[in-house]
């Protein structure tokens, strides 16, 4: 009987943990504008799993259909959009504010765990070379990097 209780408790905790992970992923995906189609989550971490205001960086795969539209339309893909995306001040890369490392560290400093593979290198490369786009509000930043097939969302607060 004691063993069944322990196994049941552990199973319940595991299911609860998986639920929190899925809810967290869904929550941060909701900040990506609707007309930017994203695929799998390449990297995600944030303070307190979205329970309170925190700091985090989330990297998603950019799907080919959006990549081709961005490649064709350029900056107008973002500036001509309605809703959330059209209201942001989108700028093309290279990011002039990232010429000094202390500036970019601010937006990516929430990365608390090791970034898999060469993902950080791809983000830095995309931000420092032409072909990508970025926008920011006081607490949120988006980078769309078609050449790297990445969408980066970071938040503070």
Regions found by a protein language model. Give the residues of each.
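Amphipathic alpha-helical dimerization/oligomerization modules
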Residues: 150-152
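N-terminal export/targeting and maturation segments
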Residues: 10-83, 87
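Positively charged n-region of N-terminal signal peptides that target proteins for export
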Residues: 1-4
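General helical structural elements
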Residues: 7-8, 104
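Functional cores of ribonucleases/endoribonucleases
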Residues: 77-148, 157
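Secondary-structure transition/turn motif
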Residues: 64, 155-157
